[in-house]
Amino acid sequence: MRVWDLHPGYLNRQSLLGEHQEIHALLTIVEEGRRGYAHHPETRRWREHLNALKMRHEMVVAEMRLRGYRHQSPVTVQGPVCWPEAFVDPPIRQFALLAERYRGKEPGRIPLPRSAQELWAQHKYSVLARDPERYRALGQRVAAAGSAPPPEDLVLELAMLLRQPPTPGGLRNALEHMWGYVHREGGLPPDGRAELRALLEAIQERAVRAGIRYLAESTALSDLAVWL
């Protein structure tokens, strides 16, 4: 049983659909008080954080929908979301586990990052949607790191940032930046949540169809859908 803390875009088909099933299993174990897996590390980790587990479910579902999988088992997030502080494995170790698991096999939508710059390029629009100041600071920090492997503290910081909701203005700002890579002609739709969802869907379709790697390998391509 495994609930990952990395963005679901790093998971291949088997891992993505497997995590979705295991989240539902965990919810059943905890909510119905079942004994099976009651002492599993993931059960202990999420027992007091069910709303956060349900938010992770929404993140997984957004990635599933981006890849064309149907979803017919919704859950409802009610009340505040408090994420567990503990990890079964820290995020940097989770990258290593995925690298071992995917050796010679189908990878995820987003390639496992070989450098801090690759990691940042994959996360930058998700960060921009949440905190422009952090976006600028992290961009400068990563530029100075060059092609060095992703440092543990950066991997952790990005994983934690993606748990936070974006701001309304940040969402639009990030989507407008992403739209700049795929627009052909015409303006942006007017402000409003429904219009922003339509804008993201247009970005998703064009990025995948045209093979624009910079966007197709971005966490934001599914991450932002959770909040629209």
Functional labels for PLM-detected ranges:
Residues 8-9, 22, 47-228:
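Sequence termini and other peripheral, non-core segments
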Residues 26-55:
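N-terminal interaction modules that seed assembly of large macromolecular complexes
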Residues 1-4:
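Short, charge-rich amphipathic alpha-helices with coiled-coil/heptad character
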Residues 16, 23-30, 60:
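Non-transmembrane amphipathic alpha-helical segments
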Residues 7-17:
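Short, charge/polar-rich alpha-helical segments
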